[in-house]
Amino acid sequence: KDGKLSKEELLNIYPDLYYYLDKTIASAEDTWVLDYMDKYKEAKVFNVYTDDVKNYILDKNKNSIEHFKWTNKFSTTRTLLSTRTDIQCYLWIDGLGADWIPFISQIVKEHESEGYYLNEVFVATAKIPTRTDINKVDIHALSGGLLEKSGDLDEVSHTCRAYPKYVIDDLETVRKTTHKFLVEHPGMKIAIVSDHGISYLSQLLHGYNLKGYKSDHYGRIAEVPLQSKVSVVSDEKYDVIKMPDNKTVYLCALRHESLIAKVPEGMGCHGGCTPEEQLVPIMIIS
């Protein structure tokens, strides 16, 4: 109607997109994030910054205190899986956020005739800033060498791909990667994990153009060396993270507006504190 497809029509025309947009079901310590992921996916696919997403962010990421309230309820992937002795191999898809849970669930379902079943699904948190170099350490420590990194959604997100190419490409990448891993690991207990997610909404909004900081990850992070003369003040726009090395302070964007320049059109991003950047899936398959 009015140029729009019904869900049934979408299922017939583009089933992978239908399953990506399906309802997010997982074990989560704060269930609003599941509804948020569904709203995020709609905004991403329609390429519009919706009021639903905006209102969630203005409420849940109003400032660093509100952000801490919900993010502190979630454990990291390493914490959730550190006591597990039953996982035989890990698939790490760089940049795979919790928004991908329904789509991967469907791919596993398609392999049920081969004996694969999705046993458990959890939502975990990445560490802030949501960068690969900060979060990959835990993944490597957790997997004990039983790790395959494949289907990189991160690297390609930093290239400009015209809408809707990035939606189409990433669906294809996740399907091929998951299918290949299942086929190559018959009879094994598998955990699909990630280091951080990706947001495709920051490209739709302006940047705050904060002065005196070094831009990192297209302004999702502003870097302040401790020896810098730039003073760091509290602000509702970002969370202040002092790194353990005591050499750097990072300002991490709480909202979709980046802290420095605007994220280029057609580009995904991470580093900040939005739920799609921060929350990652743990999917246990046997």
Segments predicted by a language model, with ranges:
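Feature captures the catalytic ectodomains and active-site-proximal regions of enzymes
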Residues: 1-286
